[in-house]
């Protein structure tokens, strides 16, 4: 009987050790989007297809379908913060981000929750953040 208990303890210890080893490997695998995060300023000159309509609506990128590769949506890395130059010259009443898993904006949706956070809004800049551990592509609309 004591021998049986020792075998169970050894098996249990081995199982725990194997589980901890798997956790350690899983935590160290790959550089997810957070491993490639960035905080940066996005000047208007970097957004080749941005436009300001006569109605005072500014768009960083067009909606799909894309007319050229230079109009692809901005890479919006996980765990990153972006300060956009504000082209309106006034504090926008509305800041809307559209997110897609595709650079051409297909299958996009309105950003919300931790994937699209508005940090600061002023006459000069709009600062947004992606707190998710996920890479998206972004289209920003200010009004």
List each language-model region with its residue ranges:
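Bacterial N-terminal signal peptides that target proteins for export
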Residues: 2-19
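C-terminal motif of bacterial Sec signal peptides marking the signal peptidase cleavage site
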Residues: 24-28
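Extracellular attachment/recognition segments
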Residues: 33-143
């Amino acid at each position: 009987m004591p021998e049986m208990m020792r075998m169970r303890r050894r098996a249990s210890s081995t199982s725990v050790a194997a589980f901890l080893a798997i956790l350690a490997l899983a935590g160290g695998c790959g550089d997810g989007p957070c491993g490639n995060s960035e905080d940066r300023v996005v000047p208007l000159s970097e957004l080749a297809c941005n436009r300001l309509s006569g109605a005072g609506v500014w768009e960083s990128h067009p909606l799909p379908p894309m007319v050229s590769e230079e109009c692809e949506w901005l890479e919006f890395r996980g765990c990153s913060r972006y300060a956009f130059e504000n082209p309106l010259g006034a504090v926008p009443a509305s800041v809307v981000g559209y997110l897609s898993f595709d650079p051409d904006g297909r299958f996009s949706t309105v950003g919300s929750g931790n994937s699209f956070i508005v940090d600061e809004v002023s006459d000069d800049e709009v600062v947004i953040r992606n707190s998710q551990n996920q890479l998206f592509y972004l289209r920003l609309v200010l009004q």
